[in-house]
């Protein structure tokens, strides 16, 4: 299975400043997509622009969250249907920053996954432990709970779901998990997916996310069971994001 290099722009980018980045990605797509799949998840305000610029390039566009309801009194939220209409085909769900900043529980993430798939969005479900949880030796316990709570029945049935392992202590800190840490956690996640979904669990891509950059991408992407990368800050630079994609070769 081809690796997936996904860029999470987080709360960064304006229409006026994103055009050149999107154009650079579009221009590089024929070369960049030789060995991997690529995806960017800009802020919701930029989804339509990104979808327009990248149309036909092979680089896909996603969102950073969606609400579980189709419509209603949910001020500030966006439904999966709205995101699809804007041009999204993917959605990040359960990112540690949403779990932290918005108090999202795994049960909420599960409902969002169900809603996303109803409208054709492919979910990237994030799991990962904090520094305190790792220090106390509970990293597999925490991630196991998150997998069980966040993934609905049938998540792996059509190999259309993606997991992103993001050690919370490595996100935006410049710290990166060691290759040994990544190998251990990705092997554990694969075991949990097979335990929960049977052989279908072997078809789920497991991305690594946590300060991925050109300097460490090759070593991380060579780790067994690493099916790609969820890239944060480095995805805001076309040069860096494309270098990470090149490392997947």
UniProtKB/Swiss-Prot annotation:
Entry binding sites for substrate: 8-10, 172, 211, 232-233
Catalytic residues in the record: 95, 166
Sorted UniProt keywords: Cytoplasm, Gluconeogenesis, Glycolysis, Isomerase
Catalysis performed (reactions): D-glyceraldehyde 3-phosphate = dihydroxyacetone phosphate
Predominant location: cytoplasm
Compartment annotation: Cytoplasm
InterPro entries tied to this protein: Aldolase_TIM, TIM_sf, TrioseP_Isoase_bac/euk, Triosephosphate_isomerase, Triosephosphate_isomerase_AS
Cytoplasm among keywords: yes
Gene Ontology cellular component annotations, sorted alphabetically: cytosol
MF annotations from Gene Ontology: triose-phosphate isomerase activity
Pathway: Carbohydrate biosynthesis; gluconeogenesis; Carbohydrate degradation; glycolysis; D-glyceraldehyde 3-phosphate from glycerone phosphate: step 1/1
EC number(s) reported in the record: 5.3.1.1
EC class: isomerase
GO biological process: gluconeogenesis; glyceraldehyde-3-phosphate biosynthetic process; glycerol catabolic process; glycolytic process
Assembly: Homodimer.
Protein family per UniProt: Belongs to the triosephosphate isomerase family.
Function description: Involved in the gluconeogenesis. Catalyzes stereospecifically the conversion of dihydroxyacetone phosphate (DHAP) to D-glyceraldehyde-3-phosphate (G3P).
Name by which UniProt lists this protein: Triosephosphate isomerase
Species this chain originates from: Granulibacter bethesdensis (strain ATCC BAA-1260 / CGDNIH1)
